């Protein structure tokens, strides 16, 4: 879900509650995903605490649809249902967890073969740099 969809967020939160924002979108998009053959859906949730109700419930709903579900968290979740994978940063500072989570998310998107302009630009920049400056 794009964060520029504020009217969607507002209307769903008003009608169904904040905890259902993502699950309602998944319900709407499910037919789009299932119409295409050989499409595998992976839902990645990001939560500093690991216990954000709207994130955990969306991952649970995605898992119920047969989609892969992964939680990247700053702290170990105490409420994550079985069958949902968790990658826990487990650090004291939320700032550190947020930075690491963001880097992992972009790398995962890139490694799965999706376009990630920020990473692609950095790879091109480093490949043009003199060998001694490449990191």
Describe the role of every protein-language-model region.
Residues 1-126, 130:
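Glycine-rich phosphate-binding loops that contact phosphosugars or nucleotide phosphates
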Residues 131-135:
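Glycine-rich phosphate/diphosphate-binding loops and the adjacent beta-loop-alpha structural elements
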């Amino acid at each position: 879900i794009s964060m520029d969809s504020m009217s969607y967020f507002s209307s769903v939160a008003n009608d169904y509650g904040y905890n259902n924002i993502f699950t309602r979108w998944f319900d709407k998009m499910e037919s789009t995903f299932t119409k295409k053959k050989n499409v595998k859906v992976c839902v990645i949730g990001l939560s500093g605490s690991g216990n954000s109700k709207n994130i955990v419930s969306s991952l649970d709903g995605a898992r119920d649809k047969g989609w892969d579900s992964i939680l990247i968290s700053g702290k170990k979740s105490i409420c994550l249902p079985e069958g949902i994978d968790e990658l826990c940063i487990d650090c004291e500072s939320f700032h550190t967890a947020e930075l690491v989570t963001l880097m992992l998310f972009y790398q995962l998107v890139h490694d799965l073969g999706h376009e990630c302009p920020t990473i692609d630009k950095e790879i091109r920049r480093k490949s043009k740099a003199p060998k001694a400056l490449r990191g």
